[in-house]
Swiss-Prot record:
Stated family: Belongs to the eukaryotic ribosomal protein eL37 family.
Keyword ATP-binding attached: no
GO biological process: translation
Cofactor list: Zn(2+)
Binding residues for Zn(2+): C19, C22, C34, C37
Chain intervals annotated as zinc finger (C4-type): 19-37
Keyword rRNA-binding recorded: yes
Function comment: Binds to the 23S rRNA.
Organism: Methanospirillum hungatei JF-1 (strain ATCC 27890 / DSM 864 / NBRC 100397 / JF-1)
Protein name: Large ribosomal subunit protein eL37
Amino acid sequence: MSKGTPSRGKRQTQTHLTCRRCGRMSYHKRHKICSSCGFGRSTRMRSYGWITKRPKVATH
């Protein structure tokens, strides 16, 4: 497969669809898992501590 402009024409298929649980375009069509909320993998909502910003704390 070549690089550059010719390979850009192969990008026509949809990878992600709208998730039924969170409504974002993050549900993977082939893997059947939402990358945003974890639908299809877990009954709990996907949430990690490293996603949210922590409040600024005085260091001195």
